Amino acid sequence: MSLEPIPAGTTLIIRHGRALLPRGDWHEPDAVDIAIAGNVIAGVASGFARVADASIDEIDARGHLVLPGFVNAHYHSHDVLAKGTLEEVPLESWRLYALPPQYPPRSMEEVRARTLLGALECLRCGMTTIQDMLTLYPFEERHLDTVMQAYERIGIRVVFSLQYADRRGLETIPYWKDIFPKELHAQLSTAAEPERQIDLLGYFERTCLAAPSRSRVHWALGPSAPERCSPALMTRTMELARRYGVPVYSHIYESRGMALQARLTLPEQGGSLIKRLAAEGALGPLLNLAHSVWLARDEIDLLAATGTGVVLNPQGNLKMKCGIPPIRALQDAGVRIGLGCDNCSCSDAQNMFMAMKLFALLAAASDPLPGPPQAIAALRAATEAGAEGACLGNAIGRIEPGYKADLTLIDMSDPTWSPLNNAARQLVHVEAGRGVRHVIVNGAVVVRDRRLTTIDEDEIYDAVEIVMPGFRRDFAAICERVKRLQPWLDQAHQRMVSTELEFDRIYRPF
């Protein structure tokens, strides 16, 4: 075999890894060498010549798969410390346990620890890019600075947005205002509440969108959900997105309650949030709608016609009784589908392998007729589609010269891979994350031999343990408060699930 010369400027070579190349066979990928120059992929070849140059790092990837780094297209770092705390809690009640408006102001130490811990978990599971839709409530500039410094230090790529709203959560959940006594209304909130002290969107434009770019930090806009944002706020959001060329992430139809709220409050748009967004000119390729569980067929057609994307989060949607998204209908319509792992308090794990497997299984279970190969579809959702939704489709999500060197190497010396019958299917249906050995972000090896290289991992774990007594104390107080609210929560939830909609997304065997 003739060897190709090493591209000029090469700083790192990955040798002999089976790589998922854009035009390659992902079921039986070929072994190749990948040359990286600085932060970009400089070349891919069946073999590059060896040179005696101590400045070039080499990774022997024999017995490894090389993947584009996963893109976690929907994530919230504000509740990383709450993993494993909840189950059998419907979405509307979950918000009262887990989300920042219910908590006292947090310390900078806690904000730093949770940001680093969440990023560490993502990196160790092969994610090189995360879309952090962060709620800081009440907003403190020093907390935002702390978050950005943590991301810069740990070395992950982040598509960052602050989550904002201008309508109170109480006004956006069916039946709450009628059922709860007025004296309890102040205790009710949702994902983001209106900021009284600051124009959060204006602040974000001045300090982030209009600021000099950073190598691994990309900006996005995060209107919490259409029902929580006035038409004026959504219009302003989309104007900024188009002016600065940044993506927009918002929640839509995560639960039956969110779909019901649209039916109750939008008669002029046929009870449809999607039609409301269309009327406001918000639909289009810049918009990513997280969850999308309770979409109607004509709404799916609108998304497809406008190039609007969705981000599915199957783990949390199942755990919080939200339902099964219409995956096959979205695929058949040609809607862009990204994948996310959502909150640690509902999905619990930032694990893209779990998300991909659930995606493939739910797609299979949602239609009795054979459809597209779901392992390949899941992998593309976790890489290319997430990159496209972030307006980074020409920079990440593919192993191709000119793209950023964001790569994950999977060690196949494991029962998961013996025998190796089909790389794509075993990645999605068998691998659980144990095989992630090396992770490269922006050309830098940030995980080597399963250990973080940028920060001592024990430093992160120690910082978490220091802040956990305060977090647990506050969480216990919240649990007591929600316990007192439970009779009215149960009444509202029962009314929500008993109100008929034109279709269902919950599996009911009898």
What are these regions, as identified by a protein language model?
Residues L81-A113, R167-A192, R256-G284, T306-G309, ...:
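Active-site gating loops and adjacent loop-to-helix segments of metal-dependent hydrolytic enzymes
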Residues R142-S292:
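Metal-coordinating catalytic core of metallo-dependent amide/deamination hydrolases
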